[in-house]
A protein has these predicted regions:
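Alpha/beta-hydrolase fold nucleophile elbow
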Residues: 164-175
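N-terminal signal peptide c-region/cleavage motif recognized by signal peptidases
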Residues: 12-15
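Bacterial N-terminal signal peptides that target proteins for export
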Residues: 1-7, 199
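Catalytic-loop region of hydrolases
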Residues: 17-89, 93, 102-105, 233, ...
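Generic beta-strand/beta-sheet core signal
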Residues: 120, 172-174, 197-198
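A catalytic-pocket lid/entrance helix-loop region that shapes and gates access to the active site
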Residues: 139, 183-185, 190-291
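Glycine-rich nucleophile elbow surrounding the catalytic serine of serine-hydrolase chemistry
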Residues: 101, 173-183
Length: 353
């Protein structure tokens, strides 16, 4: 007879620990510096550098550490260990964008649910990718090493504090954190029992090439104001809805649909019910594959049905720094020469039919 006990999480009423929280500071090594090891009482916590208080936290052992797997590394991590009712599990938290800070909100949520949890700044401070220039090891830290080193150190601290390894170890991250989760799975397949890789920003350079392709239009009149998005969306829905054999207000076969935006071009003066010739060109670029000068496809296209979310692509003359930083600092390693999208025109991505 098979019995299952998976209906409720097991909470371990940890009252006695293998060693006191403060003694975890003695676990330093040549590559690990423990900068904080103290018990935080139940209540609210406002981490240094943050203006947002984390409410309703249970008491926990808070450990902060600096990791230096290479001489040029500067990885900051925190590990939070419940003082009581640990559920026996470890949850590592991923970072978004270019990282540069710890995901305290997500750590707090995990702690409230009984997890031992950890997060890292990915080896640098701040949302920019400027840390990459002249520091190839820091780029490796950001890509995957910081997350791995954090996980190894977190498990070491868990073992020292509770006297046992976690029963299960999980990863949770979205966007950049999803990308990190996929890399941890491929490089360190035994590190986690489960990985939540939400909306992973994978092959990011290829997808972000579209951002630059749109920005090669220097004429401000090429940018489509958000007030026109509903009109464009209605036209796309009309053209694509029935491609799956059923007209039901849903686009379920976007791969079968190619919209001719010239049909929306203004016959006379500009208005909210039409596109200028330059705006037509922008719409065509957004919904066409982006390729190199040799014809290699970098990004297939933005699919029909996404028009109401075009603001990041068609809403201004400069791409967000998040995307521009990939080319400014990582590809070209030239923060001055590639400071504006227009200066990338020496080898711009192009649109293919």
């Amino acid at each position: 007879m098979l019995y299952t006990t998976a209906l409720f999480p097991i909470l371990l009423p940890v009252a006695l620990h293998a060693q006191p929280c403060e003694r975890l500071s003695q676990l330093a090594s040549s590559t690990v510096s423990i900068t904080l090891a103290k018990v935080v009482d139940a209540g609210n916590l406002t981490p240094a550098g943050s203006t947002n208080a984390l409410p309703n936290l249970p008491p926990f052992c808070r450990v902060a550490a600096d990791l230096k797997p290479t001489p040029d590394s500067d990885i900051h991590i925190e590990v939070w260990l419940p003082m009581a009712q640990w559920n026996g599990k470890f949850l590592a938290i991923g970072s978004g964008g270019w990282g540069g800070s710890l995901s305290y909100d997500e750590m707090a949520d995990a702690l409230r649910r009984g997890y031992a949890t950890s997060a890292t700044d990915d080896g640098h401070t701040g949302p920019s990718a400027s840390f990459v220039v002249g520091h190839p090891e820091k780029l490796i830290d950001f890509a995957y090493r910081a997350e791995h080193e954090m996980t190894v150190e977190a498990k070491t601290l868990i073992r020292a504090f509770y006297g046992s390894d976690p029963r299960y170890s999980f990863w949770n991250g979205c966007s950049g954190g999803g990308r990190e989760g996929l890399l941890q799975a491929s490089r360190y397949p035994d590190e986690f029992d489960g990985i939540i890789a939400g909306d992973p920003a994978n092959i990011r350079r290829n997808s972000w090439a579209l951002e630059l392709a749109v920005q090669t239009f220097r004429d401000p009149e090429a940018y489509i104001p958000p007030a026109k998005y509903p009109m464009i969306h209605r036209a796309v829905l009309e053209a694509c809805d029935a491609k799956d054999g059923l007209k039901d207000g849903l686009i379920e076969a976007p791969e079968r649909c190619n919209v001719d935006f010239k049909s929306l071009q203004c016959k006379a003066s500009d208005g909210l019910d039409c596109l200028t010739a330059r705006q037509v060109q922008t719409a065509q670029t957004i919904t066409s594959p982006v390729a190199t000068k040799t014809g290699k496809i970098l990004f297939p296209r933005v699919e029909p049905g996404t028009e109401l979310r075009w603001s990041r692509l068609a809403g201004g003359p400069q791409p967000a720094d998040l995307f521009l930083d990939e080319f400014r600092y990582v590809v070209y390693q030239d923060p001055i020469g590639t400071g504006e999208a227009s200066t990338l025109n020496a080898t711009p991505p192009r649109r293919t039919q």
